[in-house]
Curated annotation (Swiss-Prot):
Domain called Protein kinase: residue spans: 68-352
Key word Lipoprotein present: yes
Tissue: Expressed in stomatal guard cells of leaves.
Lipid addition sites, S-palmitoyl cysteine: C4
Gene Ontology MF annotations: ATP binding; protein serine kinase activity; protein serine/threonine kinase activity; protein tyrosine kinase activity
Task of the protein: Possible bi-functional kinase. In vitro, it exhibits serine/threonine activity. In vivo, can phosphorylate tyrosine residues of limited substrates. May be involved in plant defense signaling.
CDD domains: STKc_IRAK
Sites bearing Phosphotyrosine, chain numbering: Y151, Y251
Gene: PBL9
UniProt-recorded name of the protein: Probable serine/threonine-protein kinase PBL9
Amino acid sequence: MGICLSAQVKAESSGASTKYDAKDIGSLGSKASSVSVRPSPRTEGEILQSPNLKSFSFAELKSATRNFRPDSVLGEGGFGCVFKGWIDEKSLTASRPGTGLVIAVKKLNQDGWQGHQEWLAEVNYLGQFSHRHLVKLIGYCLEDEHRLLVYEFMPRGSLENHLFRRGLYFQPLSWKLRLKVALGAAKGLAFLHSSETRVIYRDFKTSNILLDSEYNAKLSDFGLAKDGPIGDKSHVSTRVMGTHGYAAPEYLATGHLTTKSDVYSFGVVLLELLSGRRAVDKNRPSGERNLVEWAKPYLVNKRKIFRVIDNRLQDQYSMEEACKVATLSLRCLTTEIKLRPNMSEVVSHLEHIQSLNAAIGGNMDKTDRRMRRRSDSVVSKKVNAGFARQTAVGSTVVAYPRPSASPLYV
């Protein structure tokens, strides 16, 4: 169940791996245990009590969103639609458009495949937790067949939008902001993995990282979250759910879920931030469609790292920073689960890299500049060669291919 809390959602490409798609690939037979699912409740009995949440009436949310008018839609998908609305900051009652607190109201389709269980997980997790890097759930509505969630409005939308949109009117995220977003998201995951919470997020990806007005990252979409293992258990066995390109290989193979599964997903997103490429893009040449597989050989070679780095980031980082981010990404992506860092370690590494960026101020030495020019020259030649080949056969050149990372289907 995805969260689309910004006015920028409509800018997403129709081919994107969105937060609205189905995520379940079903049972893996003997390799994974199925999750026992209780019947969907028709009362608030299964909702954990939380003083932080308000139980809204359907009429209140209808008024707050101007009767769910089409021009209030922020986004839509398999779960239903997200509407923009306004409520009074103190009373939390509906207010006139443009006044009070801006909210995002997610309205679940009554016959939507994402269903009540994910809605319930969202309410219970976000209702119990409060952290600056988790999106704030203000309240919910459970009335008759209506299922709605009320969130704080995130004015800058998702990381996915900022990282992959192209065009004359869109400014790419700077290196400094990418580090800030990565660190904020890492802190959110570290909080979930802490001994006090013990939650496995299970769907960490760019579309689930939302940004406030100051580009502070907040994790959204807790419909797939699971309680972590307890006692002497090392993992949770469950059906494999998530998004292709982000799920850890051992989780795909066995259905065994651990916090290190989230660490792998973080490594993928860190690589997306570094490269400006999507985790999976079927519109790229066959050898470049899977970002992790394509990038790994370059990341282990200091002289080839610049072939992976987003060429829109010229002169914004030092060689030392680039190498450290590449190394951290590789550590998160290793197939040896025990060798992956925990998220607290990741936070420490990113804080160090961020301090390097602040100290260096974007200045590079002569070696950095020489290697950058060489890398840019290689990239430019490849782009021009590709352009010439496509033009020669009379095909349309797509400067910015549609993304194609997809959810895990049955």
